[in-house]
């Protein structure tokens, strides 16, 4: 007879097989399970802002800037209908955004009528500071969702290659970006970039000047940003043959799912943005009623509803406030020496977004890079206050958090489906190896019919970890 110990071992083996593997996220104090649980707490709060609030569901952006820092003549524009962005006319612009235009950082009225202030020295991205309203467009982020557009090929690859090459750091006090010639990338020709999507996490093979904590964080943010976008595209994929929007599991596995480091970096980016919201919550707790933070709308009722929804989001995030220890970054003198270089290179990525040939991709690229830049400003610049952020930065931060939240949720569902497919493929391979025709074909057919049964089994076993 089988002993109790043997039965327990068998049960543990079966149980471990049914569970999705837990990922310990380096440079954080959490895991994939912790991220799933944090996500479940704010899942219903984020859409209140990003879909129903005029303040957070709209965005003002210089979308059609003519200059591109990568190449002089850029005619590789996406002609697909899915690449187009629907902008707002003057009548459609929400009142809250019309009012915000009166409180630009360059406006003297900002000092007395609104508590928004602006310090460009702390920026981790280029913000649109033009005083000409003709250079901006207002867009509804709800009406222009991030999804598959068909924009791909050599031009898209060149954009990503240029972004990856920004992880070349040089500690040079005389390094002036304005004096660097405009070439095919915003880096010096003799700088050799690292491969952000390397499958080897062992930094011991790198020189000490390269294998520092901050450079790895830079790499992970860009890697997670790319993996998150790929996940959104796979989650909202247009099947040309069937003429419908669907999910593309095979493409997700090829782009993201087959690379554990990319999945981990999605979770890392969630942790980074979550910690930025915690930082905001910490500051809001210290704001007195006499100098309360407002969103500067014309309608006090709208202001109250927006403030309440935003406050609920950041305070729920505050419940899990020890996710990333921001004091670990730029802690020693060597790291502090290239902090300006770190900021400059991340800022250059926001300029690369002007070269994207797809309008909708450019829009969401600008929004999300601004969101990550805002998170870095809050976490890496201790003097940054909530009142130092521009409205576009706060909106970008919340919408980027919404995007990474969708990526985390989609990663869970894609992983369940991938595990179901792998299990059935393994069973069918065993059948084909054990039985002969026609028995093996018949058995394999019946196994295919159990897909939803296995999927439900994996779901039941794993869903308590994400609730």
Curated annotation (Swiss-Prot):
GO MF annotation terms: FAD binding; protein-disulfide reductase activity; thiol oxidase activity
Write out the catalytic residues in the record. Answer: 358 (nucleophile), 361
Alphabetical list of InterPro entries matching this protein: Ero1, ERO1-like_sf
- Please report any disulfide bonds recorded for this protein chain, giving both cysteine positions: 68-355, 78-83, 114-296, 358-361
Location in or out of the cell: Endoplasmic reticulum membrane
The yes or no answer to whether the keyword Lipid biosynthesis is present is no
Q: Which domain of life is it from?
A: Eukaryota
Q: Where, in this chain's numbering, is FAD bound?
A: 147, 149, 160, 223, 226, 255
Q: Which GO terms describe its biological process?
A: protein folding in endoplasmic reticulum
Look at the named UniProt entry and state the broad enzyme category this protein falls under: oxidoreductase
Sites where a glycan is attached: 110, 129, 286, 421
Q: Which interval of the chain is the signal sequence?
A: 1-26
- Pfam families recorded: ERO1
What is this protein's function per UniProt? Answer: Essential oxidoreductase that oxidizes proteins in the endoplasmic reticulum to produce disulfide bonds. Acts by oxidizing directly pdi1 isomerase through a direct disulfide exchange. Does not act as a direct oxidant of folding substrate, but relies on pdi1 to transfer oxidizing equivalent. Does not oxidize all pdi related proteins, suggesting that it can discriminate between pdi1 and related proteins. Its reoxidation probably involves electron transfer to molecular oxygen via FAD. Acts independently of glutathione.
| Subunit and interaction comment | May function both as a monomer and a homodimer.
Record-given protein name? ERO1-like protein 1
Its organism's taxonomic lineage begins at: Eukaryota, Fungi, Dikarya, Ascomycota, Taphrinomycotina
């Amino acid at each position: 007879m089988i002993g109790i110990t043997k039965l327990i071992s068998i049960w543990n083996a079966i149980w471990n097989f049914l569970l999705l593997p837990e990922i310990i996220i380096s440079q954080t104090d959490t895991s994939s399970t912790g991220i799933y649980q944090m996500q479940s707490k704010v899942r219903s709060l984020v859409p209140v802002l990003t879909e129903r609030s005029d303040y957070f569901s709209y965005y003002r952006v210089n979308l059609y800037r003519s200059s591109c820092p990568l190449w002089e003549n850029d005619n590789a524009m996406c002609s697909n209908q899915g690449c187009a962005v629907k902008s707002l006319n003057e009548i459609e612009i929400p009142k809250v955004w019309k009012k915000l235009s009166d409180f630009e950082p360059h406006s003297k009225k900002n000092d007395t009528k609104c508590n928004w202030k602006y310090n460009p020295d702390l920026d981790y991205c280029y913000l649109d500071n033009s005083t000409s309203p003709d250079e901006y467009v207002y867009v509804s982020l709800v009406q222009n969702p991030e999804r598959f557009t068909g924009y791909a090929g050599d031009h898209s690859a060149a954009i990503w290659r240029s972004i990856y090459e920004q992880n070349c750091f040089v500690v040079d006090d005389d390094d002036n970006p304005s004096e660097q010639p405009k070439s095919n990338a915003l880096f010096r020709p003799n700088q050799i970039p690292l491969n952000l999507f390397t499958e080897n996490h062992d930094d011991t093979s790198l020189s000490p000047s390269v294998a520092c904590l901050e450079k790895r964080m830079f790499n992970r943010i860009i890697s997670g940003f790319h993996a998150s976008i790929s996940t959104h595209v796979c989650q909202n994929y247009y099947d040309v043959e069937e003429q419908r929007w669907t999910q593309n599991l095979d493409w997700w596995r090829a782009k993201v799912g087959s690379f554990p480091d990319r999945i981990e970096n999605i979770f890392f980016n969630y942790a980074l943005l979550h910690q930025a919201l915690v930082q905001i919550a910490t500051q809001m707790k210290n704001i007195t009623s006499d100098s309360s933070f407002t969103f500067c709308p014309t309608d006090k009722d709208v202001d109250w509803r927006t403030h309440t929804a935003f406050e609920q989001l950041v305070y729920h995030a505050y419940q899990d406030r020890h996710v990333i220890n921001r004091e670990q970054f730029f802690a020693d003198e060597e790291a502090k020496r290239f902090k300006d270089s770190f900021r400059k290179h991340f800022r250059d990525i926001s300029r690369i977004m002007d070269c994207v040939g797809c309008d909708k991709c450019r829009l969401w690229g600008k929004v999300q890079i601004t969101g990550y830049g805002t998170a870095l400003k809050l976490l890496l610049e201790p003097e940054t206050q909530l009142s130092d952020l521009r409205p576009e930065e706060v909106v970008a931060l919340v919408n980027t958090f919404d995007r990474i939240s969708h990526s985390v949720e989609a990663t869970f569902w894609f992983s369940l489906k991938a595990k179901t497919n792998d299990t059935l493929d393994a069973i069918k391979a065993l059948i084909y190896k054990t039985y002969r025709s026609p028995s093996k074909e018949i058995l394999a057919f019946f196994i295919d019919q159990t897909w939803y049964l296995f999927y439900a089994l994996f779901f039941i076993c794993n869903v308590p970890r994400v609730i």
